[in-house]
Design a protein with these regions (language model features):
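Metal-dependent phosphohydrolase cores
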Residues: 1-187
Length: 187
């Protein structure tokens, strides 16, 4: 469950965009529109009760992956709506993987299926979203992603995990890299 050191979500890691009011910024309003119907869903909000990486809640991690996947796909003209949605739902599971053991396979290859099943219960998913959620742990999952948006989520997920693990010590480095990214690519 959520540790006492987990801080409330105010923005995506490394971002200076204030998520407390998503409607005040044009880019954030566009991001929010992509997530209509799922961002405030009770099952998604429950992710805030679970720790993902060190002091990051699973909800914060999912928003991090969702937001940066949205930005990258938007920048290249890819399906940023599906990337934002799949990024938010890619870790929609409610067990502690450090405690729960699976007989079939390890957590890395099993939880994408659990997340996909849970996501299907709360919203309709398109083929890109299904692929991205199901294969976001590639190469731990045997089949590689089929769509470019799925690859974006796969790699953004890994980058966010590294930043979340290192956040306390190296937050300045992450912020510096994200500033350079924003100056170079984001509108």
């Amino acid at each position: 469950m959520k540790g006492k050191d987990v801080e409330p979500m105010h923005s995506a890691i490394g971002s200076r965009k204030d998520f407390s009011n998503l409607d005040e910024d044009q880019l954030l309003a566009e991001y929010k529109a992509c997530l209509e119907g799922i961002l405030d869903h009770a099952q998604v909000m429950k992710l805030d009760l679970h720790t993902q990486h060190c002091n990051t809640s699973r909800l914060q991690h999912s928003v991090n992956v969702s937001y940066y996947s949205f930005l990258i796909c938007r920048m290249f003209g890819w399906d940023y709506r599906s990337a934002a949605r799949a990024g938010l739902l890619h870790d929609l599971y409610f067990y502690d993987w450090r405690v729960t053991k699976y007989l079939r396979s390890g957590h890395a290859s099993w939880h994408p299926r659990v997340a996909l099943d849970n996501a299907k219960k709360i919203t309709e998913l398109n083929k890109v979203e299904i692929d991205a959620i199901e294969k976001h742990m590639w190469p731990c999952t045997p089949v590689p992603p089929r769509y470019i948006e799925s690859y974006v989520i796969t790699f953004v997920d890994k980058a966010c995990a590294v930043c979340e693990f290192a956040e306390r010590k190296y937050v300045q480095i992450a912020e510096s890299l994200m500033q350079k990214f924003r100056r170079s690519y984001a509108s």
